[in-house]
UniProtKB/Swiss-Prot annotation:
Keyword terms, alphabetized: DNA-binding, Repeat
Coiled coil residues, start to end: none
The protein, known as: Histone H1-like protein Hc1
DNA-binding as UniProt keyword: yes
GO molecular function: DNA binding; structural constituent of chromatin
Length: 125
């Protein structure tokens, strides 16, 4: 079976299971039995689907379309944050600036150098 055929069978089975579940909730015993048998069929077809999808991935048949790839790239990029400005409140004492200050961004921790032990010469002869 091809991957598309297997996917089609799975969707058909899922739809019929859903319809029979609604009937089984109302008390239909035959529908409940159909749900049980169809769920077993679905398990078997799902196993086939997993195998076929792995083969398709290895062969390169399941590639993303160009539009989907562009959306994924756009979502991966993070927007650049602008520097935040904080305005000081005016005060009544002496001189107070009302200029906006740029809040500094956090810097990475400075790298520490690893100290190496000094080699000592032995005095034994």
């Amino acid at each position: 079976m091809a991957l598309k055929d297997t996917a089609k069978k799975m969707t058909d089975l899922l739809e019929s299971i859903q319809q029979n579940l609604l009937k089984a909730e109302k008390g239909n015993k035959a529908a409940a039995q159909r749900v049980r048998t169809e769920s077993i069929k679905l398990e078997k077809i799902a196993k086939v689907y997993r195998k076929e999808s792995i083969k398709a991935e290895k062969m390169g048949l399941m590639k993303k379309s160009k539009a989907a790839a562009k959306k994924a790239k756009a979502a991966a990029k993070k927007p650049v944050r602008a520097a935040k400005t904080v305005a000081k409140k005016a005060c009544t004492k002496r001189t107070c600036a009302t200029k906006a200050k740029v809040k500094p961004t956090k810097k990475a921790a400075p790298k520490t150098k690893v100290k190496t032990a000094k080699k000592t010469r032995s005095t034994k002869k």
